[in-house]
A protein has these predicted regions:
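Residue-level recognition of single "structural anchor" positions
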Residues: 1-194
Length: 194
C-alpha cells in the first residue's frame, strides 16, 4: 500500500491533539523544579513562539505555541501548564531573563493561582537542560520546512512534543528506548489491535 506524504501530514494534523490528550493520563509525575523557556518557530514566514516547560530531570511538563512573546502569552502558557500539573507542588521556576516571566508569575501569585512560596530564578545557565531539549523539536520543525498555517503548526508540534515525551520514557510502564513498548502503548490508547 502506498500513502502520499500529504495524507500522512493530514493524519498528523488531525490526530496529534488526540494523541496528546490520551497520553496525558499515562504520564509519570514530574518534579517540583521547572525549567521554562521559549524558542522561535516560523509560521507563514513570521516568527511565533513555542513556550515549553520541563522539570529538572528533563521531563516535559507542557508546551504552547503563541503568536506573541510577552507577559500575557507567558501567563497563558503557565495557566495551561498548571492544568496538567499541580501548581501547588511547584517549588521553583527557572527562566531566562525575559521580562515577561516575572510579570506573569507575579500576576499568578496575586490571583492565588501560584503559591507565594514558589521561587522564581531568572538565571540563564540553569536553563541549559531545556535549551538542549529544544533541539529535538527544532530538528522536526526544520525537517518539515516550516509551517504555512498557525493551527496546523500548533497541532503538528503537539504531535512532536507528545512523541518526544513517549521517546523520553515519560509514560508509565514504558521505558526510554523501548520502541516495541512505545508502539504497543500508542496502539493501546487508540484501541488498535496489535
Amino acid at each position: 500500500m502506498q500513502v502520499d506524504h500529504s495524507t500522512i501530514y493530514r493524519w498528523v494534523v488531525a490526530y496529534s491533539p488526540e494523541l496528546n490528550k490520551r497520553c496525558r493520563r499515562h504520564l509519570k509525575s514530574t518534579n517540583d523544579s521547572w525549567r521554562v523557556d521559549e524558542t522561535y518557530i516560523k509560521v507563514k514566514g513570521e516568527w511565533t513562539y513555542l513556550y515549553r516547560a520541563i522539570d529538572s530531570n528533563g521531563n516535559t511538563i507542557d508546551f504552547l505555541l503563541t503568536e506573541n512573546r510577552d507577559a500575557p502569552a507567558a501567563k497563558m502558557f503557565f495557566l495551561k501548564a498548571f492544568g496538567h500539573s499541580d501548581s501547588r507542588k511547584i517549588r521553583v521556576i527557572n527562566t531566562d531573563k525575559d521580562k515577561a516571566y516575572p510579570k506573569a508569575i507575579k500576576e499568578l501569585k496575586e490571583l492565588d493561582i501560584l503559591p507565594d512560596s514558589v521561587e522564581h530564578r531568572a538565571v540563564r545557565y540553569l536553563n541549559n537542560i531545556i535549551e538542549q531539549d529544544h533541539r529535538y523539536i527544532k530538528r522536526r520543525v526544520i525537517a518539515s520546512q516550516n509551517f504555512r498555517e498557525f493551527k496546523s503548526a500548533s497541532r503538528t508540534i503537539s504531535g512532536y512534543e507528545t512523541m518526544n515525551m513517549i521517546r523520553k520514557g515519560q509514560i508509565q510502564n514504558v521505558d526510554r528506548g523501548d520502541i516495541l513498548g512505545q508502539k504497543k502503548f500508542i496502539h493501546s490508547v487508540f484501541g488498535i489491535a496489535v
